Amino acid sequence: RADSPGMKYKHYAPKAKITILDADSREFTEYVNSQKKEGLFALCFEEDVPFLQVPYISLGKDETDQAKHLFAALRELDERGAQEVYARCPSKQGVGLAVYNRLIRAAAYQEHTLDGESEA
């Protein structure tokens, strides 16, 4: 059985290295802020924006927004010269699961869980 093209290849991936961080808003923003360096971007949700101290692209406030904005956000990372990206993990249920599936492929399956100690 052959895999469908959507399952075989890394789609819609920017040039930057993407790592998905499975974390709540506080853990995500604290970790990303602690990693500040040239070329670092956050791919975040609207609730994270007030706390980030690095360049970011918000996917929006809910799963529908995230699905709508993901591909444009990935292209924008290239346009803005991102070299490394930490992306907050979307919900793995409902529409969020579709967003997660596209994002995990763009991240070449790089995902880490933050446990409150800011270690990825």
Regions inferred by a protein language model and the residue ranges of each:
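A C-terminal functional module that forms or caps the active site or interfaces directly
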Residues: D3-A108, H112
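Short, flexible loop segments at boundaries between secondary-structure elements
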Residues: E111-A120
